Amino acid sequence: MGLFDKLTGTKRPADGVAPRAAEEVQAALLGLNSPDVPYVIRDGGAEGTEADLVAEWRVLEPAWRTFFLRTQLSRTFKVHMRLVPEKGEVRALDQQFEVDWVGDTPRLALSSESQRGQVKTVSKRWSLGGGEDGSREETFSFDSDDLKGPLQSVVLKSGWTWRGVITGKL
């Protein structure tokens, strides 16, 4: 792996893994959807972008809204993906927005801050005295890899390259 690959988050499949058809890769990515995970993978056509698929946190879905509201999540995160069958790769562009919870019935409001490219975010919250021995106890953890990790794993197991995009088009 070269320096540029490290900067972009590009990952290649293990040697000997046969590449699968684009339809199979897309179906495998969509197969990650489950009511038990805090993210959703959907068709990217509705975004008006060149993405084939978009993965994002389920911030506004009623079943997950309480969780995200309780943790006062301050960022929301999306991964735009385009499948490139002729190269056997999934090109991925991250997008992160700062958000605020507003109103009596809290709702999400996007702020003016956002990031595009390859985003790595880790947030943790602890409470003091929460552990059995009076030590600090982690009460909340958010890691952008909790969303990207499963996506990358499916792509690599399908024999395709995960190519991170820093700027420009997918």
Model-derived features: where do they sit?
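A composition-biased, non-transmembrane "mature-region" signal
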Residues: 1-170
